[in-house]
Structures are given as C-alpha cells and as structure tokens.
Amino acid sequence: MDFRYLPRQDLQLLIDALRQQAYRLLGPVVRQNAIVYDVIESVAELPVGIQDEQSPGSYRLHQVDSPRNFAWANSPQALKPLSFAPRESLWSARRDEHGVLSFEPCLPEPEQIAVIGIRACDLAALDLQDRHFLQQNADPAYERRRESLFLIAVNCSHPAATCFCSHSGDGPSVKTGYDLVMTELDDGYLIASGSLRGKLLLEEFSWAVASAEQRREAELQAQASIEQMQAQAAPDLSATDVLTSRLEHPRWEEVAARCLACGNCTAVCPSCFCHREIDETELGSPTTTHLREWDSCFGQGHSYIHGLTVRSETRLRYRQWLTHKFATWKEQYGRIGCTGCGRCISWCPVGIDVREELVALCEDAAHV
C-alpha cells in the first residue's frame, strides 16, 4: 500500500479540504463522558490524550499524557445510523375523492457526509449491512445514504479488554471498504487511499512517502494490538455452527436468569438490522405514512404474530439472537454477524460477556 506521511499539524488541511468539497464532517468528540461522532470543523475539537477503559458492563474515559487523537477503542455507536436510519418513512398512501389509493415512495435526499476515525470492526459491520440491504433487491433509502458517505478509517492501536476483532478476522487493521485509511503515530499519521475519491483527495497534497521506519512502527503497533487481544480468552468463532445443535443446553436458562432483555446489545451492535414497520394515520386525513424503525429481537413484541408471541421467554430470545448472529448468519451472508467490537459486552447493564457464553455453549459437548 502506498502510504504517505501526514504530519500531525497538517491534519487540519485534510479537514479543510473535505469541508471545501461540501462534506459535512463527523469526527470523534467527547460528550457526556463518552466518545461519540459529531460535526467538527477543527482538529481542536478531536479528543487529545483520551483513552477508554472497557469491561463487562463498564465504559469510562481517562486522560493520559499523549498527543494522540485516536487512542481509544470504539464509541458507543458505530456507523449504522448514517446508513440505516433509526426511524424513517418508506412510503405514503393517499385516497382521493373517488376512493382510489395512490402510493408514493419516501426517498431521502441525504447530504454528503465524511466520517473520520472509523474502526476496522465498524467498516466490517458496514459490509455486513451492505450484504443485507444491497444484495438482490436493494433498499433504495439505505443505498442513497450509503453512497453519500466518505469514510476515513483509523487503524486501532488501543483495543479495549472487550475487543475481539482479531478473533473474528476483522481487525485491528482495516482491510477494505474505506476511502482513506490512517495509522496514528505520536508525531503524525500514515495515510493511504482505498478508493478513487480518496486517491483524488490525496493528490491535492504533496505529503512525502512514509519512511521504512514509520511503516515498521505502524506494523509493530498493529502486532501489539493483535497480541493484546489474543492473550484474552475467546471462543473459536469458526466453530460456532454447533449452536444450532445446542438448543436445549442448560446455559440458555443460566444466561436468561441474568439477562434483562433490555436490547442494549442490539442497539449498540453495528451489524444488527432488526426493525418493525408501522402505519401512521391522522383523523380526517386521507394520507397514511408507512414507517420503519429500529427494533430488537429481545423485545417481546418482535416475535408476535397472529395473536401469539413465538419467543415469549428471555431464554428463547437470547437463544435466537446468539444462534442467528454466530451460526445462521453464515447461511444467509457467508460469515458470522459479529465483527468483535465488544460493544454488547461493555454496554450490557449486567455485564454478560458474549465470549464466555459462546465458550460455554460451543465447547461443551456434554449437552448436545
């Protein structure tokens, strides 16, 4: 890969170039003691020397003596809201004075958005969303939003204790799906393009080719991140197909006794796409609007059909979520539905660690 070296003080030049191309730039900022993506205009708005500490049921930030802007693992929310809107109108129906119904699609007109600071796990999750929404009959609303995104990834150098992207094969280094990719060093960044748009943008600058020493430092940084994650216990994610043969395992009852079925895990998951569709009407109005909004398979109403809640117990809902994510996704999309970001672990209010549950369920053959 043709890496250039971007001095730290020149990052503002990249931000300015994106804004001059009419992109609305989103970057990581600290809001209410968490890293979130928000509109930025200046590099001064990025976090400096901020790291995150994550563990089951816990997320906190702390300050360190470092000039780095991207020395954190991940934020509570990924890219999903930018392409798969939490709530949107799909179509409207109107009855005219003769009683004839006409239908109109409600297609968004998304603005051009650039995002800086994206992690490998979130780009991999975006690819999973693409497989769901764009294969066969493409979702037009998703497609329009997806095409409006300019993605600047930053390779992860500080994975959290909850991260396991090296086990899923999705990180910590970015592989595909970006317009630009950066690796942060103490004094600057290595930067390369991954698309024609990214290449054309880089050609506006005369940054020098990265030295062998700088490239070596980036490689060592990536290797250290991998070793940090590999040192933690994690399941063999290539063998999770066995979940479909462990449907009566007693572990489902054990985890259900702890699970609140709150849906936090699916809300922060970058790849979950469960939703519900509703119709909104107004008294006296001839128009009905058909809406789609995020839902969770942990909600009791999600499996309600024809007067029956199919998965009425938390045990059944947790089983559905885990077996779909780690087993039957392979049949649908060719891989598991998890990219190892660890958000479902950090943001679970009772600290359920999905890695522990997978080990207990997949490696115990006594209850097949």
Stretches with model-predicted labels:
Residues 10-14, 265, 293, 353:
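General structural feature for long, well-ordered alpha-helical segments within catalytic domains
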Residues 21, 262, 341:
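Single, functionally critical "micro-switch" positions that shape active/binding sites
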Residues 24, 265, 344:
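Residue-level detector of anion-binding/catalytic polar loops
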